């Protein structure tokens, strides 16, 4: 009750499920994930950092109410490239953080204004349609970012610690794909299955 009241009053503390987080860990050969940044959008190894970017979803709301899928994919691809470049441009508070951030080359791509988009489309925040729209946009962004990262790795080489973690990363990506395809079972290495994207509930068929 004390934790709930504190979270309601100040948004802290945050509670994290250690086992679930580490089951989705792409690089466990480097150690377990023990914590996150204060807002919890970055969960990775100790002494690492990444630059963050958020795409404004309302910028892709068309006049007819539909979502600009191609424009959003282009933005996700472009920002993935920008964030990759930023690894070389960033300044870090310690040599260790700088080295590990360079070795793993993590990037943080997200979106903002999902509440505004749902209101503009007349969807309840906690409706099946609202949740499925959010899931579809998130899946599209995640898949585009991973595909763009793979393209860059093909040309420039993978990040330094990829070889050690390749099976884990491919397992996590495969689990993401299963969730995006609506699977309710068959996940690899997960005690708790994720909530899948339900394409039938998504109000914009172009997203699925």
Where are these regions (language model features)?
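Polar, glycine-rich mid-to-C-terminal structural blocks
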Residues: 1-10, 173
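Function-dense linear segments that define catalytic or interfacial modules
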Residues: 7-121
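Coil-to-beta-strand transition motifs
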Residues: 12, 203-204
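Short hydrophobic-aromatic micro-motifs
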Residues: 50, 204-207
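Internal maturation/activation junctions in enzymes
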Residues: 74-98, 102, 106, 124-203
